Amino acid sequence: MQLSLALDDRPLLPRMRDRLLARLGPRRDGRRRDPVSQLVRSMLGSKTRDEVARRVFTELRRRYPSWDGLTEASPRAVLRVIWPVNLAEPKAEQLPQALRMIVACTGHLALDHLADLDEQAAMQWLRRLPGIGSKTAAAVLNFSTLRKRALVVDTHLLRLGGRLGLLPRDADCDTGYEQLMRQLPDAWDADDLSELHRLMTLLGQTICIARAPACTACPLRDLCPRCGV
């Protein structure tokens, strides 16, 4: 008797997402900040633990109920609030600079005009701002009310992508963003991309950690050429 095996010949990313959803459950969050608030939150969160960045963002918002006040703040005043985050000193310089540049370019402190641009043009616009790389720009576009199709690529996604063969092992955030975006199914929307980011980040924080990953517990172990290496 001949057995018929049902092989999943889909590209790797859709298979990964299905496995992660089955193990970790849905990771969608309907709460979205306005784009300027998301920019501030993402700049604070760069290279900083989420719980620290959340706490500092809340305190910064309390100190500056309107972000217009932050445009006029001195780096020293900003640093007194954001000191717990990593790279606090350059961020204290860059935050007011970025907001002032938005005002200079648009006439007011808002990023609503990005809604009319495609993803690539919006990314390029944001990356002209001080302190904004591809990760922060993608977070503004994807996590905010702009709800654009941009994948936020952090160190966890770079590590998973390198181990799974989706990316070169030495890829940086820019390369990772460009290459992963090309591999995403066209049918996936902004919510699909934000969920993929959260799923992969959670896997990277709990199982596929930087050192001594728990490969035997990983739902992607049979898809990973570096499993057990």
Regions of interest found by a model, annotated:
Residues 2-229:
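Catalytic cores of DNA base-excision repair glycosylases
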